[in-house]
Amino acid sequence: MQTKQDGRLGTEKIGKLMLELALPSVLAQIVNVLYNIVDRIYIGRIPDVGSLALTGVGVTFPIITIISSFAGFASGGGAPLAAIALGQKNRERAERILGSSTSLLLFFSVLLMAFFFVFQTPLLYLFGASDNTIGYASTYISIYLVGTVFVELAVGLNTFISCQGHARTAMCSVLIGAVVNIGLDPVFIFVLHMGVSGAALATVLSQALSAAWVLRFLTSKKSGIRLSPRTMKPDFAILGSVMALGISPFIMSATESAITIVMNHGLQTYGGDLYVGSMTILQSVLQLIFVPVNGFTNGVQPIISYNFGAGQFDRVRQTIRRMIAITFTAAFVYVVFAMLRPALFAGLFTTDPKLIAIVVKVLPVYIAGMAIFGLQSGVQSSFLGLGQAKISLFIALLRKVILLIPLALILPHFFGVMGVYYAEPIADVCSVVTAVTLFLCNIRKILSKEALAKVTHTEA
């Protein structure tokens, strides 16, 4: 049975669909990144200890990123495959993909929470904590870990709502958590004097509400594919396909942790706590654009997957062209503005003149390559939407594992602390050129009945 909601993905005008599906996703991600940014702004302004508290929370990002990465492991593979199945009018398979992915998320939740509770202290030191910042880092992450299952379900299952074309519902799940977090942060941090503990508690409560919203929808009659105990029995053939496709977004996200570890270690070795703090600000500046860009590509991806599954390749081409043009333009304009106004962004997060001076110096260097990175964002999302696991995996590995991490380890030996910052733009430019080349060389072959048959055969 085909619902009106998912059927329109193959019939309505592409421009209208992109606006209707991507706009809610973008708005949701903007609010989502704002609550993360506001979190850091509040922490950075805690009286007397703001800079150290901000640095301490910053070194927990690898753990937080890894937790979110495992959610993307299930959803990044499961949602595109579910959308392709919907395009083929195979709702039963789409529901089995949803159920198996949910079981995988629950398994990840237990595993991750147990692991990080046991090893958090040595890991935090490895990630760049010092004796001055370990207390703030440990306090924050201990509370955050309690809500691991909420993060996995809220992040991991929301894409199964958007892949059906329910963009506004998916947006609401993010907005609920974001608004609650923004509202609770100042109350817990300043009014109740809970400091870093308050920031973590606000995050856990907000994620719990988001998870409840997502589960309520996916188990209701409003959802085109419904989650039920019957479909949650793991289907290992499906899980194999989900993980094969999901490994690319997983590596893209999880390797951010490895990058943060390597960079924080280099910054701590060659600079000190303030340089580690600068990386927290730099990553926040990039999030302000690339989280919304990812929201846009996530919103558009169901159009690509559905029409690919339906064999409507002309609609796929039109969607991809428009998506890449928009992601490139948005990223280019924002990055150039940030390069010209580094003090404006630094001042959002700290009043410490020494930290501001560092950010003003390094921000234009660090984000320079991101001016063209919108091209890769569009290309990467296209490959994922088309079920191209191997190419997506290679692109993810190239930028972060093959290029960025080795450069961040090698360049500081020649350029000191600035070598850590130089690594990013070099890796970005090389990666974008490679991704675009692969796209141009492979897209015609991918948009064929033969390629579609291979994708659906491995999943069946």
Model-assigned labels for residue ranges:
Residues 54-114, 151-170, 278-342, 373-392:
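Small-residue-rich hydrophobic transmembrane alpha-helices
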Residues 66, 181-185, 211-215, 287-291, ...:
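Hydrophobic transmembrane alpha-helices of multi-pass small-molecule transporters
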Residues 20-39, 143, 177, 206-210, ...:
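Transmembrane helical elements of multi-pass membrane transporters/channels
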Residues 75, 144-162, 170-178, 199-212, ...:
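Short runs within selected transmembrane alpha-helices of multi-pass transporters and secretion channels
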Residues 1-22, 82-149, 191-247, 304-369, ...:
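Short alpha-helical transmembrane segments in multi-pass integral membrane proteins
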Residues 30, 34-55, 124-131, 187-194, ...:
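Helix-terminus/linker motif at the lipid-water interface of multi-pass membrane proteins
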Residues 19, 34-35, 74, 115-119, ...:
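Residue-level signal for transmembrane alpha-helical positions in Major Facilitator Superfamily
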Residues 15-34, 38, 63-70, 146, ...:
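Residue-level signal for short hydrophobic patches within transmembrane helices
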